[in-house]
A protein has these predicted regions:
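Family-specific signature for flavin-dependent thymidylate synthase
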Residues: 1-234
Length: 234
């Protein structure tokens, strides 16, 4: 079962108050809750991304495929920390769960091929173990579909970039599912996170007003189309 757990003891509960208070120090402004929140929103809307590096989120991610979790390693802004379940110490030869894509699940012939391949891998791992091959070697057979677990510590600025890219309709379906689940979890975590999620955790095309992808899904016009229209108006 896919699950995203926010570690409340470590995750910033009031990110807007934190941003506003720190920004207020820079400006020598009066510090209070309402002014801090207003100042934070103003900073974010003005594009001062540096202040978004202050709030941190700590997560336990479980039930997603190793393939999907690999995508998190490509988001390196703000030096995020990732700790993933070890393939050297967990007894995967006793069996492992996999994430099956809907395209396979909804195709009986494809599903038969898929599950046979997974079964063959499990049998091969058991056979290699019996032959004395160490766990750190026979677990190299694990497929990218196997379900893994991860701790992810990430700041708001990196999360905004992540959400802009991974809530896009062209993102891989499972990482898009993860993004939407995380957005929902943070919206329920605190009122300030709800504001942030609604305003910032959107596809990039919604944020900038046009599509930057080479293959556009049609949700927004492409950048060249928008620039062309602006040029005609000028």
């Amino acid at each position: 079962m896919k699950e995203i757990k926010i570690l409340e003891d470590y995750t910033t509960k009031t990110p807007l108050q934190l941003i506003g208070e720190m920004a207020g120090v820079c400006w020598g402004a009066k510090l209070d809750k309402d002014k801090n929140i207003a100042r934070a929103i103003d900073c974010i809307k003005s594009g001062h991304g540096r202040v978004e590096e202050l709030p941190d989120v700590y997560l336990v991610i479980e039930g997603f495929s190793a393939k999907a979790l690999r995508e998190l390693y490509t988001h390196i802004g703000g030096l995020p920390t990732r700790l993933q379940a070890s393939t050297r110490y967990i007894d995967y030869e006793k069996g492992f769960d996999v994430v099956t894509p809907p395209s396979v699940e909804n195709n009986n012939d494809a599903a038969e091929v898929w599950y046979k391949a997974i079964s063959d891998i499990k049998m091969a791992m058991g056979a290699l173990k019996a032959l004395g091959i160490p766990k750190e070697d026979y677990t190299n057979l694990l497929p990218l579909a196997y379900q893994s677990k991860m701790i992810w510590k990430v700041n708001l600025r990196t999360l905004v970039n992540f959400m802009n890219l991974r809530t896009c309709f062209r993102a891989y379906w499972e990482i898009r599912e993860f993004s939407n689940m995380l957005k929902k979890a943070l919206m329920e975590y605190s009122p300030e996170w709800e504001i942030i999620c609604k305003e910032l955790f959107v596809p990039k095309c919604d944020a900038v007003g046009y599509c930057t992808e080479a293959k556009c899904c049609g949700r927004h016009k492409t950048k060249s189309e928008v620039i062309g229209e602006d040029a005609k108006q000028d």
